Amino acid sequence: MNKEVLSNQALKKTHLVSCEVFDRRLEEHLKPSQKKDQQISLNLINTRLWLNDLGQKYNRTVTVDTIPDEAWVEKLNNYDIFWFMGIYLPSQFSANHAKKYTHQYTYALPDINPDKDVVASPFAIADYLPNPHLVESWEAWDKMVKKLHEADKKVYVDFVPNHTAVDHPWAREHPEYFIQGSRDQFLKNPNLYQAIGGQNGQTHYLAHGKDPNYPEWSDTLQLNYGQEVVHHIMTEKLLSLVEHVDGVRCDMAMLLNPSTFLRTWGWTLNEEEKQYIQNHQFWQEAIPKAKAKAQSLNKLDFEFMAEAYWEKDVLAKNFDYIYRDELYKHLVRVARGENPYHLKEHIAHLLECAQNQGQCKDTVYLENHDEERAIKTMGKEFSQAAAALISFLPNTMLLINQGQDEGRTIRPPMQITRSPQEKSDQQLKSYYQNLLQLKQSKLFREGQWSMAKAHGQATNLIVLEVISSDQTIKALVCINMGKNQTQAYVPQQNNYRVISSYQLNKNLYSHLENKETSFNLNLAPYNTELIFFAS
């Protein structure tokens, strides 16, 4: 055997050994990270729908504290936090109001029965007590929370500070807690007010809850934050929740900012009330109190997530997470054919912001209970690429809506208690499982992220780079956001050499031949490929 053959065999043997060493090293870096403050995954659970689904599956009544262990298995594997929506005492007024619009819910339930299927909005809260149809008591609720804590998971619930249900006891007992109008104002604008009989026999005209840019929510009443007592009682409600959960998602949080509240309701307030609002920002005062109570209960990282669409810089001073609806809007526009230039700029901005660990983090999503299903808005293939993109963004919380990870296409109205009949998309379900477990790894959670360069005509290609904390492993996350095949080449990564790749859409792992200068990238439409390097 000549020297050249021996040399080639030696090189092959060395390459195999190198691959084995790399595989072991990569395997270690792809193990789940114990660090839970980056790339967090949150599952939004419509509690009524999920328990109803489980009840049908197991042919028995299922409450929060009697959910079978097997129903938790996939969720515990995929998610860090569970946001239970709609757990509070339901409003009968809201349920009756919703039945007037039964015809609007038939797209989800063609055979809808208004007496059985239509319920109150989860955001028209009659009181911050458990809905007895879902969980008997806070003690029973705490039993479920304890089980999730044992699995190292967290639980969020809603806090809706802007308004109450129309039939909340305060409406009759304490009408002074609400924005009020006169009888003449009620007659001129009956849609804005609700006539409520007080305990003294007097009729009060209480305003419905409102966003300044949209019509009023007719099953709610607007709390008056110009009153010190309202700040106090709502802070007390918030503090009571701290005992039972690990965080709260704060509904329409920006509505309580002084500038927004005055823009919406300033015309109804006296000068003393206006001055009080300007001098007492609710979140600035209430959140530190809630966190102090949490610490006294040994909950050291109680969290606040804001649903907010403006004045985020104000909220960011106190909140831990805020909705990133700008990213969602960029993705929708690209899905509809817009050049992804602005999307790339926005991603670069988010990566830069992630370097500042102290600031409020983003909650990113493709859909939620308000938005249309991602498959409907973006198409199945694009939604997969978009899911990969937002999943790997560092220092964020990824929100996955109930049914999104199964490929559901029908968005359930908030006022129904039975899920639309749909079959799960098994391919999409597997895709999300692979993606969600991959993003939990040490490499992706603990690594340093940045934008990477790829050369060529790949307009729709987005490449993210992550380097492991010990700098021995590097990965490029290459995502084709377009409908055409994408080709590009990636320069050699300094002291790193490419060894393997993982095609997320195919769940296919492959060894790659070493390249000294660069390697060619050839991505199918809407596909994601991860290229791994070793130092």
Feature-to-residue mapping (PLM):
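Active-site and adjacent substrate-binding regions of carbohydrate-active enzymes
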Residues: 2-535
